[in-house]
């Protein structure tokens, strides 16, 4: 935890859309009179048939039902494209930056309209109808955005599967939502390496007899097999169709997309988002959290295969008529200056990335950052996991030169958009804290029995009432939706995250509740111990898990990756134990420290703690599915060098 407070800079108070007084006024209105508040905010998007009903929601476990703006009709692609054509047809909608730094493209709103209509007509020609599910398994290229918006235009439900997932994972997601059509590319490119997307698709489709059509975008030109009658080249089909396509009129509660997310148990859940409430919330959070002004160049580094890419590369920014940057590559290719070079090249004003990426770049030192200008930057954002204060301070001081506020955003695939975050012109920030709730969001902290905890406290984070961006169900399994989120603390949405609220009412996400350690009866979030370790000057990254301990119940097992060039010695191991004792207290002292050259991460950068827990428990006979790991070989090293070997 950092005690430092960073006040809102004076110039931000003047120019921000929301200042401190406006935040207080709007937040109170959103809680005290949600009907009136959301009636007004719903008008930020265009409706074909205006809504008269605002909110019809129940968190009662016997009748969980979430509906917003339910009698209104609209089309998401119209809100992202057509409504901007009168004023900004020639404005750049998407800047595409290729994996190769010499390749980029700029797509205007007029061009986006034509490309999306063409793609929509190709889908229709292949038999895709309103309500059909379409699986998109694509690299980060403009055609991925065209495909998503084309589905929205004709009322098909897209299910985007991250291009790093294995054929098995892809097959499971295709089967679960009964997709009849898959959109893919010949190959993807990341960090100079090719990813065989079409070959993976072919492998997956051996288990998916329901797929009748595969549309293939030619990206690298690599040789791929094409199955006659099923597979078509997108460019050939696009040449046959018109660049106009009338949008389908959709009910606010018609599905827009399904996105699969891992649960703590069982197969991935198909998180279902609908059209009206999601679009209102994505647009609104993008504008207020990032203080988006007309003309800003906005870059979110996520992949469209994750919810962050859906809400904050595509739907939110485009609904607001923004210029959004899509990046095919990785932060350290060809070298560790890549992100900062892209910011200079495209004069990016708002930059939104993940702590994992920042910690990796921190390891490389300041020089790769300092040799770039970054003078266009105005605002920095963090997403995906709690950001440790050390990384926050580096981000602020080194990347932002001490002049850019940081919005540390907390939300989930399930929430559709940001729930807790500073608004940069309204809320002073504390390194490591997501600070305050967004409009309409009522966080509560409860203990294990469900009792609401007041004031400064620690416990389980729940949300007390619905918001428009909330998921509506688990696709095809409403009972799982109810059991996962509404049974444990009846009448509340349970986030699965632990949280601390400080004496100023600021919220600090402490990690998943299943990442909580109980050491000698003391509760401790793994994020807290990790932050202490990473604060040591020789440590680049740390992950902490519990393991069975004869005396304490649970011991603390720390996996530590050192800064490049530092040696893993017994002296350093002892020094780190002393360091953590000093930072948090004796109760937090790691019992075992394993130096690790790398940690098992998914391709989106999340650490697979399940694997780390198994290794720490000396139980690696069943490590589960490791196909989603970016580098499965790190697991072998971790097992070989584990510190808790039996006997």
Swiss-Prot record:
Recorded catalytic activity of this chain's protein: acetate + ATP + CoA = acetyl-CoA + AMP + diphosphate
Pfam families xrefs: ACAS_N, AMP-binding, AMP-binding_C
Cofactor(s) essential for the protein: Mg(2+)
EC number(s) from the headed UniProt entry: 6.2.1.1
Binding site for CoA: 190-193, 308, 332, 520, 581
GO biological process assignments: acetyl-CoA biosynthetic process from acetate
Annotated keywords: Acetylation, ATP-binding, Ligase, Magnesium, Metal-binding, Nucleotide-binding
Binding site for ATP: 384-386, 408-413, 497, 512, 523
Positions bound to Mg(2+): 534, 536, 539
UniProt PTM comment: Acetylated. Deacetylation by the SIR2-homolog deacetylase activates the enzyme.
Function, in words: Catalyzes the conversion of acetate into acetyl-CoA (AcCoA), an essential intermediate at the junction of anabolic and catabolic pathways. AcsA undergoes a two-step reaction. In the first half reaction, AcsA combines acetate with ATP to form acetyl-adenylate (AcAMP) intermediate. In the second half reaction, it can then transfer the acetyl group from AcAMP to the sulfhydryl group of CoA, forming the product AcCoA.
NCBIfam families on file: Ac_CoA_lig_AcsA, PRK00174.1
HAMAP family recorded: Ac_CoA_synth
Name of the protein described by the UniProt record: Acetyl-coenzyme A synthetase
Organism of this sequence: Parvibaculum lavamentivorans (strain DS-1 / DSM 13023 / NCIMB 13966)
């Amino acid at each position: 935890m950092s005690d430092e407070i960073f006040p809102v800079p004076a110039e931000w108070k003047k120019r921000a859309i929301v200042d401190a007084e406006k935040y207080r006024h709007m937040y109170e209105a959103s809680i005290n009179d949600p009907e009136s508040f959301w009636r007004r905010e719903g008008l930020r998007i265009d409706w074909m048939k205006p809504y008269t009903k605002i909110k019809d929601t129940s968190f009662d476990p016997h009748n969980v039902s979430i509906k917003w703006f339910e009698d209104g009709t609209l089309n998401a692609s119209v809100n992202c494209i057509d409504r901007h054509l009168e004023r900004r047809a020639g404005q750049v909608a998407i800047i595409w930056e290729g994996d190769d730094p010499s390749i980029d493209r700029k797509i205007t709103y007029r061009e986006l309209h034509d490309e999306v209509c063409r793609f929509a007509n190709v889908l229709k020609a292949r038999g895709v109808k309103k309500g059909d599910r379409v699986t998109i398994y694509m690299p980060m290229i403009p055609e991925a955005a065209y495909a998503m918006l084309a589905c929205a235009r004709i009322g098909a439900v897209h299910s985007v599967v991250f291009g790093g997932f294995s054929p098995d994972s892809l097959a499971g997601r295709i089967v679960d939502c009964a997709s009849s059509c898959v959109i893919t590319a010949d190959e993807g490119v990341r960090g100079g390496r090719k990813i065989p997307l079409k070959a993976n698709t072919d492998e997956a489709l051996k288990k998916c007899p329901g797929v009748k059509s595969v549309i293939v975008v030619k990206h690298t030109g690599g040789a791929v097999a094409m199955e006659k009658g099923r597979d078509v080249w997108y460019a050939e089909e696009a040449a046959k169709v018109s660049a106009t396509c009338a949008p389908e009129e959709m009910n606010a509660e018609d599905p827009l997309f399904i996105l699969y997310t891992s649960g703590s148990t069982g197969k991935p859940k198909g998180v279902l988002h609908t059209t009206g409430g999601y679009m209102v919330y994505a647009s609104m959070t993008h504008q207020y959290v990032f203080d988006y002004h007309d003309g800003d160049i906005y870059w979110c580094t996520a992949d469209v295969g994750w919810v962050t890419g859906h809400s904050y590369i595509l739907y939110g920014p485009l609904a607001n008529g923004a210029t959004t940057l899509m990046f095919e590559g990785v932060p350290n290719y060809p070298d560790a200056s890549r992100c900062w070079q892209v910011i200079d090249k495209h004069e990016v004003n708002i930059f939104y990335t993940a702590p994992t990426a920042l910690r990796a770049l921190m390891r490389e030192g300041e020089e790769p950052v300092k040799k770039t200008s970054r003078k266009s930057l105005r605002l920095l954002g963090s997403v995906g996991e709690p950001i440790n204060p050390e990384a926050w301070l580096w981000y602020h001081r080194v990347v932002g030169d001490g002049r850019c506020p940081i919005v540390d955003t907390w939300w989930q695939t399930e929430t559709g958009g940001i729930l807790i975050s500073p608004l940069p012109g309204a809320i002073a920030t504390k390194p490591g804290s997501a600070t305050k709730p967004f409009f309409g969001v009522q966080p509560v902290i409860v203990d294990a029995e469900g009792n609401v905890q007041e004031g400064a406290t620690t416990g389980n984070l729940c949300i007390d009432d619905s918001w428009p961006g909330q998921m509506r169900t688990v696709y095809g399994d409403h009972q799982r939706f109810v059991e996962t989120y509404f049974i444990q603390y009846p009448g509340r949405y349970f986030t699965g995250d632990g949280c601390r609220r400080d004496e100023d009412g600021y919220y600090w996400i402490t990690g998943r509740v299943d990442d909580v350690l109980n050491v000698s009866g003391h509760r401790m979030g793994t994020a807290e111990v990790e932050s202490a370790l990473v604060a040591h000057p020789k440590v680049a990254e740390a992950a902490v898990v519990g393991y069975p301990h004869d005396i304490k119940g649970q011991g603390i097992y720390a996996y530590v990756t050192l800064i490049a060039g530092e040696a893993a010695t017994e002296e350093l191991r002892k020094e780190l134990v002393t360091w953590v004792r000093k930072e948090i207290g004796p109760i937090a002292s790691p019992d075992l420290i394993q130096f690790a050259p790398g940690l098992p991460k998914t391709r989106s950068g999340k650490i697979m703690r399940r694997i780390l827990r198994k290794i720490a428990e000396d139980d690696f006979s069943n490590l589960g599915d490791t196909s989603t790991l970016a580098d499965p070989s790190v697991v072998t090293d971790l097992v070989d060098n584990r510190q808790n070997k039996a006997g």
